[in-house]
Amino acid sequence: YNPNVTIDDGSCLYYGCTDPAADNYDPNASVDDGSCTYSGCTVAPFLETFDAFGNLGPFTDDFGAGGSQGATVAWTQDASGTSSGSTGPSDDITGGGYYMYTETSGSGSNKTAILFSTCVDVSALSDPCMQFNYHMYGATMGTLEVHVDGVSVWSVSGDQGNQWNDGQVNLPIGSTGCLIQFVGLTGTSFTSDMAIDQVSVDECVSLAVYGCTDSTAINYDPAADTDDGS
């Protein structure tokens, strides 16, 4: 505010919540002050194992919910291996539990599967990250992406071997309502069943770097901190 001004030039700044999806959205605010609040958000830290059949925790399969976010095939809760050989996991990462996967037999190839979260409140975390395990085994494997607030922040394509791998993405510091999507872009045939498991939102951690840690070996990897037997 300038008391000497007689004509408003439109430069006034009004602080408040500028997100229309928030409970306390202020249509008069021009600068977001980080005060937005959202009802029904999942508060971090949390861990979703998918082990309670029929219960996906804070996540929803978009295809099963009508496909409003663009899904053309489902993420399916499963245990003990997928129906096709030479693709997909044989078990969940801990053994004996459930995971989420995309079935690409029949009409499931060249499709998009979307698993989306409720809003996630990470404001209690100083360095928020989402950690998860993924399995991408198959000769015609497609692409797995993670989107945060509509932006792709992580992507892996192609056959990653017949094992569970570790993934981690940073989440926006201070956010009281970020949105997460796992987007599976299936491959060209039935050997592209991808899966995810053990999704957690917590403080960031240092992930293991697998490779040959023997400095006398010809394939020694100085960046590796965990030997993978190669």
Show where each model-derived region lies:
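Extracellular calcium-associated, cysteine-rich motifs in secreted modular proteins
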Residues: Y1-T42, S206-S230
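Extended, low-complexity, turn-rich repeat/linker tracts enriched in Gly/Pro/Ser/Thr and Asp/Glu
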Residues: V122-S126, H135-T143, T188-F190
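Extracellular carbohydrate recognition
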Residues: G108-A113, T186-C204
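Extracellular carbohydrate recognition and processing domains
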Residues: G150-S175
